[in-house]
Amino acid sequence: MQQKRIIVDCMGGDHAPGEMLAGAVAAKAALGGEYLLVGVRAEMESAARARSIDLSAFELRDAGSVIGMEDDPMCVLHAKKDSSMAVALRALRDGEGDAVVSTGNTGALFTGASLIVRRMQGIHRAAIATVLAFEKPTLLMDSGANVTVQPDFLPQFAVMGSAYMKGLFGIEMPRVGLLNNGTEACPCRRRRTACCPGCPVSGLSGMSSRMPCRLTCVMSRSRTALRAISA
């Protein structure tokens, strides 16, 4: 099996680039694979010397700037298109790796992933996915970035989440729940209807035309509700 190649934005997040370099070293030791480290080369090399990290097993790519947490998300496309995040995303788009890892500005990463890498055919809106630390593997889809979504986005989120759970955890038919931010009976019937079991998912090229799951509609903000979905 061909080794996966991970592209790492080494300038995002707290204590970068040192922490990202240390993480790449740990990941390579534990999981193998190849890693492309993107960042301001002088800063990466300085951080590596300070931590006695050997970078000889990694490919380094220089970037001209860094996107800060306070920056406008659109800067990844314009003002800071030479940033480590933008360079990493373009490398993924151009087929130089299998995934990008970044702990930087979430809005910029979401924007760049959608408009540089682009979405899969048939997916109209990207969604942030968060694995929750419950007894059973649980994935919370659309856990940030999207303020409002259209009803037809929800089945697409379900398909993407189901594919993730099958690929990562080997769950053939994940249980999908619709979690509402509120306690009213059903604030948006159209959204609930769009996610009904067996609802045709149109326009998803290469994917199943029907939902491979059972719907659970949970109306609560609580952790208990999330546990109900994962049960």
Per-segment meaning from a language model:
Residues A29-L31, R49-A57, F169, C196-V201:
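Short helix-capping segments at alpha-helix termini
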Residues M1-E45:
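N-terminal phosphate-binding or glycine-rich loops at protein starts, especially the Walker A/P-loop
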Residues G18, E34-L36, A42, V147-G206, ...:
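Glycine-rich phosphate/diphosphate-binding loop of Rossmann-like nucleotide-binding domains
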Residues I53-G97:
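Phosphate/nucleotide-donor binding subsite
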Residues I6-G18, L77, A145-P155:
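Short, glycine-rich nucleotide/cofactor-binding loops
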Residues A91-F110, E184, R191-A231:
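Glycine-rich phosphate-binding loop
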